[in-house]
């Protein structure tokens, strides 16, 4: 047993309705007991089980909320679509290339470049409170480039999803059935 009492939580959002009868499960002046990396107990500090922990961490009065879950990400890509976003915000027609612009940049990028960018995005997500990410391919659009994207994604994520038909690639613009057969 390696349990730690975490106290100094001004507000805990537990998502456990047993705490306050709401879906949020808000507890004021709260504490957690963590067993290795899993929550063993949560509730009001005054109700914390005694002698159930070996160490104590005092957070100094912060709020604690569950980690965010991002259920739709593409971590492996190259390029930048800010010009497309700007055009849309200005009410211009969508002619910026969109996904296909990103596909071209991703195909041209090295594995090392794609991996560095994916690692950076994972770090930024974690620092912003996202603790669970589902990531998918979708910016290769050839069998080889999709497999390359999935291999890179597996280096930064436990679960990855194949999205080979994000859009039809330019080289299959008029041959949709052939592309579906390829994928």
Language-model region placement:
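N-terminal metal-binding scaffold of metallo-dependent hydrolase/deaminase domains
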Residues: 1-50
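Fold-independent oxyanion-binding glycine-rich loops
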Residues: 8-9, 36, 59-60, 117, ...
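Conserved beta-strand scaffold positions in the cores of enzyme catalytic domains, especially
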Residues: 5, 53-58, 160
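Metal-coordinating catalytic core of metallo-dependent amide/deamination hydrolases
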Residues: 100-117, 133-183
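Metal-associated gating/positioning segment near the N- to mid-region
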Residues: 48, 59-117
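Divalent metal-coordination and catalytic microenvironments
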Residues: 9, 32, 37, 61, ...
């Amino acid at each position: 047993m390696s349990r730690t009492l975490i106290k100094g939580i001004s507000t805990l959002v537990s998502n456990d309705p047993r705490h306050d009868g709401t879906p949020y499960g808000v507890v004021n002046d709260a504490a957690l007991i963590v067993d290795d990396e899993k929550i063993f107990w949560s509730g009001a500090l005054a109700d914390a089980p005694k002698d159930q922990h070996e160490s104590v961490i005092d957070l100094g009065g912060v709020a604690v909320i569950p980690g965010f879950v991002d259920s739709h990400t593409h971590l492996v890509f190259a390029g930048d679509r800010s010009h497309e976003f700007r055009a849309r915000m200005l009410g211009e027609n969508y002619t910026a290339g969109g996904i296909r612009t990103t596909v071209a940049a991703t195909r041209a990028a090295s594995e090392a470049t794609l991996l560095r960018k994916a690692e950076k995005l994972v770090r930024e997500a974690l620092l912003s409170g996202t603790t669970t990410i589902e990531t998918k391919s979708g910016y290769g659009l050839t069998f080889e480039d999709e497999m390359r994207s999935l291999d890179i994604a597996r280096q930064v994520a436990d679960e990855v999803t194949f999205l080979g038909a994000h859009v039809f690639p330019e080289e299959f613009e008029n041959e949709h059935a052939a592309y579906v057969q390829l994928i």
